[in-house]
């Protein structure tokens, strides 16, 4: 029998202000990778993390 998929998946968090902010330290978009339990957290994650491109703490949203 085949083994079932685990509940944990790898997701990518992207800075929401890097796309719109023109006055930032360096060009580009900051991304973090992390894992989440798809059974406990079905909605998309939103975490406040440090963005080195914007040089401050910003909201990072889960992307596909």
From Swiss-Prot:
GO terms for molecular function: structural constituent of ribosome. One of its GO terms (cellular component) is ribonucleoprotein complex. Disulfide bonds: none annotated. One of its GO terms (biological process) is translation. InterPro entries: Ribosomal_bL33, Ribosomal_bL33_CS, Ribosomal_bL33_sf, Ribosomal_zn-bd. Pfam families: Ribosomal_L33. The keyword Ribonucleoprotein applies. Keywords: Ribonucleoprotein, Ribosomal protein. PANTHER family: 50S RIBOSOMAL PROTEIN L33, CHLOROPLASTIC, LARGE RIBOSOMAL SUBUNIT PROTEIN BL33C. Belongs to the bacterial ribosomal protein bL33 family. This is Large ribosomal subunit protein bL33. It comes from Synechococcus sp. (strain JA-3-3Ab) (Cyanobacteria bacterium Yellowstone A-Prime). The gene is rpmG.
């Amino acid at each position: 029998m085949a083994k079932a998929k685990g509940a944990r998946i790898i997701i990518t968090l992207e800075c929401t202000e890097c796309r719109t902010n023109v006055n930032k330290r360096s060009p580009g978009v900051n991304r973090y990778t992390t894992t989440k339990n798809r059974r406990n957290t079905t909605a998309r994650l939103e975490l406040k993390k440090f963005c080195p491109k914007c040089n401050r703490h910003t909201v990072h949203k889960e992307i596909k």
